[in-house]
């Protein structure tokens, strides 16, 4: 899935590219991509550090969304399959 498709799926209104939901979805796509890369290249510690930074950033944004709009948080979690 490319960036434009992700934005279209998670945007709230037309032209929305920076909402919390879109940011979480884009970070999740990058995290999945880096995870696959690290399975092939386990000693790539530079990329591993980048992955940890992305995971931390996504965690903070998810926490913000959970406090701001719990219903939207549940929808995003369900769409992305992040938690139970």
Curated annotation (Swiss-Prot):
| Entry GO terms, CC | cytosolic small ribosomal subunit
Known SUPFAM superfamilies for this protein? S15/NS1 RNA-binding domain
Pfam families under this entry? Ribosomal_S15
Classification via InterPro entries: Ribosomal_uS15, Ribosomal_uS15_bac-type, uS15_NS1_RNA-bd_sf
* One BP annotation, GO: translation
Which keywords does the record carry?
Ribonucleoprotein, Ribosomal protein, RNA-binding, rRNA-binding
CDD domains per UniProt: Ribosomal_S15p_S13e
Q: What does this protein do?
A: One of the primary rRNA binding proteins, it binds directly to 16S rRNA where it helps nucleate assembly of the platform of the 30S subunit by binding and bridging several RNA helices of the 16S rRNA.
- Tell me how this protein assembles: Part of the 30S ribosomal subunit. Forms a bridge to the 50S subunit in the 70S ribosome, contacting the 23S rRNA.
Which family is this sequence assigned to? Belongs to the universal ribosomal protein uS15 family.
User: This protein is called what?
Assistant: Small ribosomal subunit protein uS15
Organism from which the protein derives: Thermosipho africanus (strain TCF52B)
Which taxonomic lineage does the organism of this UniProt entry have?
Answer: Bacteria, Thermotogati, Thermotogota, Thermotogae, Thermotogales
């Amino acid at each position: 899935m490319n960036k434009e498709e992700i934005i279209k799926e998670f945007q709230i209104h037309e032209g929305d590219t920076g909402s919390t939901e879109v940011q979480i979805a884009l970070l999740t796509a990058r995290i999945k991509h880096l995870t696959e890369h690290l399975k092939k290249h386990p000693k790539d510690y530079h990329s591993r550090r980048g992955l940890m930074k992305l995971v931390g950033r996504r965690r903070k944004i998810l926490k913000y969304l959970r406090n701001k709009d719990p219903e939207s948080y549940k929808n995003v979690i369900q769409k992305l399959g992040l938690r139970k």
